[in-house]
A protein has these predicted regions:
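N-terminal leader/targeting and accessory segments in enzymes
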Residues: 1-90
């Protein structure tokens, strides 16, 4: 499925890369990322998934959905939204 199809029901800003890419899975648990995944960064009481971006990129994530300001890593699409929890619900 194309990333742009998952994003069509919400407001977002492309920080880097393209939405015209094929994705395999939608995940919010960094341990479950695989090649061509979209990783949605959820900030929790104990940990902040934004901290795991370098790890998921190494695992092959094709795109990252963030709500905080981050420095993009080359070769990965970065999508910024106001609320990543809402974005995850809309994309599911």
């Amino acid at each position: 499925m194309k990333l742009e199809k998952l994003l069509e029901r919400m407001d977002y800003k492309v920080l880097a890369g393209s939405t015209d890419i094929e994705i395999s899975t939608l995940v919010y648990d960094s341990r479950k990322v695989e090649k061509a995944s979209v990783f949605v960064c959820i900030s929790g009481a104990v940990s902040d998934a934004h901290d795991f971006i370098p790890d998921v990129v190494k695992k092959g994530a094709a795109a990252v959905v963030v709500e905080k300001d981050v420095t993009p890593i080359e070769g990965v699409t970065y999508i910024k939204v106001d609320d990543t929890r809402l974005a995850l619900a809309c994309m599911s």
